[in-house]
Amino acid sequence: MDPFLIKLIGFAAATCTTVAYAPQFIKVLKTRSARDISLGMFLVMVLGLALWLIYGLLSGDAPLIASNAVTMLLAGGILVMKLRYG
């Protein structure tokens, strides 16, 4: 398969999974309520994203690096708001 197409698919997948966190982030930011969000899920998710980011950095995989860096910021922000707002 064409390497450009492979990268394009990677960036498209990365964009979809990253953008998926934005509505939740915005909702918690606006309502100042994270009561119904699972703390355990976001703790594990942020850890997993950090590990994927490290893997992407070590392997030089641009889609992994970009998507996991941004997603980790969004998920980490939700985690911080969960701890702050409950």
Curated annotation (Swiss-Prot):
InterPro entries: PQ-loop_rpt, SemiSWEET. It comes from the Bacteria. This is Sugar transporter SemiSWEET. It is found in: Cell membrane. Pfam families: PQ-loop. One of its GO terms (molecular function) is sugar transmembrane transporter activity. The chain crosses the membrane at residues 3-23, 37-57, 61-81. Keywords: Cell membrane, Membrane, Sugar transport, Transmembrane, Transmembrane helix, Transport. It is a multi-pass membrane protein. Its main location: membrane. Mediates sucrose transmembrane transport down a concentration gradient. GO terms for cellular component: plasma membrane. Homodimer. Homooligomer. Residues 6-63 form the PQ-loop domain.
